[in-house]
Amino acid sequence: LIEEIWRILQQRPIQLDSVKQMITQIAVCQANPDIELGVSGQGADRLISSLYGTTQACREDPGVAVYRERLTSMDSGALQYEATGFARAMHDTGLVSPYHAVLLRYLLDHGDHLLSEALGLSSTGRDCLLCYGRLVRAMIGEAVHPQTAQAIYGLALLLERGTLYQPPAAPALWRQLSLPLSPYCQERLALTFGPEPSPRAWLMQGVLCMLGQPLGVGQGNNPTCQSARALSMWAYNDPDYLLQMVVWAARDDEIIIHFEGQPISSRESASGVATEIPLDLDPVSLLVVPHLDRIYAEMGRRCLGREGDPHRWVNPEFHGWWSGRGFRINVDVEPGRLDQLEDFLRHFYAVTDSAARFVGWHAITVLRVTLDPKEVMRVYFFNPNNDSGQNWGNGVEVSTAGNGERFGEASLPFEQFASRLYIFHYDPLERGELAQVGVEELQRVKDQIYQSWGVDRLPADVLQASNGCASPE
C-alpha cells in the first residue's frame, strides 16, 4: 500500500482525497497497539508526517487552533524554520499539511521573504511573487484554508511556471477572485466538497491547482477523457482561455463553443458521453466538464453521415488551434480493418522525429520525444486517466518514473508507443517527408499491432499472408 501511494504521488495528481484517506488509515494502524506492522510499515513515517506532523511545532498533531496559537509566540527565525520544513515536505511529496495553510495565512502580515520560504520558491517564483504580491496575497486569503491546503502547492507551481507574466493571466485571476457563482454551482461545490470554508474557496483552490499542475488533471470514474485533456491543454498553453471557460460555467451555467461557424450551447445540447453528473472530480472539472462533455457529444452528432472518423473534424474545433488540422488514422472505420498501416507509421515517425514537439491532443497528449537516460528514444505524454501507470498488453507497460519523466508525464519507448497509436493530428504545413524508417524496425511495430489490438482487424492481404504461412501446404 505504501509503495502504491508513493507511485501515485510521483505522478502529482490534483485529486488526492483517496491518497490522504489511505495515509490516515496507516496512521491509525500505527497508533493502534494491537496492530503490529513490522517491516511492512517502513516508509510510512514520511507520508504521515507530511500531513500531520511536518515540523517541530506540530509534531504531535495538536490541532490547527493550538498550532495557530503557537505561531504567535515565534520569532522570525522560528517562523522561517517552520516555513522551510513545510515547503520541503510539500515539494518532496506533493502533499500539503493543513498546518501549512495555517502558517501561510499567518505569514500574510510578515513580508515577502517568509511567504517565499513557505512556498519553497526558486528565484523565478520569488520574482513572480514580488511582481504580483498583492494578487498572490489576495489568492491566499481566498483559497488557502486548512480544508483547501492543496491550493498552496498549486500556487507555488503557478509562480514557478511564470504563468502570471502572461499579460492576460493576472487580470483573469483578479476577475476570478470576484466572480459571482450561480446558485447551482454553489450547491454542486458544497455538495461535493462540503460547505466549509466556502464554494468560492474550493473553486479558487481548483483554479490554482489546475494552473500549477496542468498534467495532474484526471477524468475520475467518468468517460470524459476528451474534456479532461482539453482542460489540461488549456491550463498548459493558454490559462486565460481556461479561466474564461470557468467564468462561463460558474457564473452563467452555460458554455458556447463554435463548430464550423455554428454556435453550440451546452445548455441547449442533448446529453453527453457521461450518463450521470460526475462528482469525483476537482472543483474546476466538476463545474466545467459537464458543459464540455455535452458540447463534444453534440459536435459528434453533427458529423453523423460523414465518411471516416468524426475526430477528424471534432478535435480541432473542440480543443482549438493546438490540435492540428492534419489527420491520420490506421483503421478503415466502416469495416474496422487496419488500413495503410506502413504509411501511417512512417508519417508518425516523420512528424515526431523532426521537431520533438507537440503532435496532437486526441486520446492522450504527446508532450515531447527525446532520448531517455539510457539513450533510448521515448515518447513522453499526458494521460488523463487518473493513473498513467498502465499495462497496455503484450509487454507494453507505461512508465511514470525512472526513465526521465517529469511530474505528471508517462512514457514508452518510441516503437512501443507507435504500436498502440491509431489516430494522430499534425500540422499539414509542417508534415515533411515520410520518415526513412528501417524495414526491420517498421516490421517490429507492425508485428506488435498484429499481435495485440489489431489481431481482429487484419486487412485481407495480411490475413492471406498469415494463413499461407500457417498452412502445411
Predicted regions located by residue number:
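N-terminus-biased targeting/localization segments
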Residues: 1-93
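Generic structural signal for hydrophobic core residues of well-folded globular domains
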Residues: 5, 9-12, 26, 30, ...
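Cytosolic terminal low-complexity segments enriched in Ser/Thr and acidic residues
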Residues: 107-108
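Long amphipathic alpha-helical scaffold segments
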Residues: 116, 120-217, 223
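Active-site signature of cysteine proteases
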Residues: 132, 328-473
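Active-site nucleophilic cysteine motif
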Residues: 218-233
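Short, glycine/acidic-rich hinge or "gate" loops at secondary-structure transitions
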Residues: 239-251
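Papain-like cysteine protease catalytic cores
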Residues: 248-356
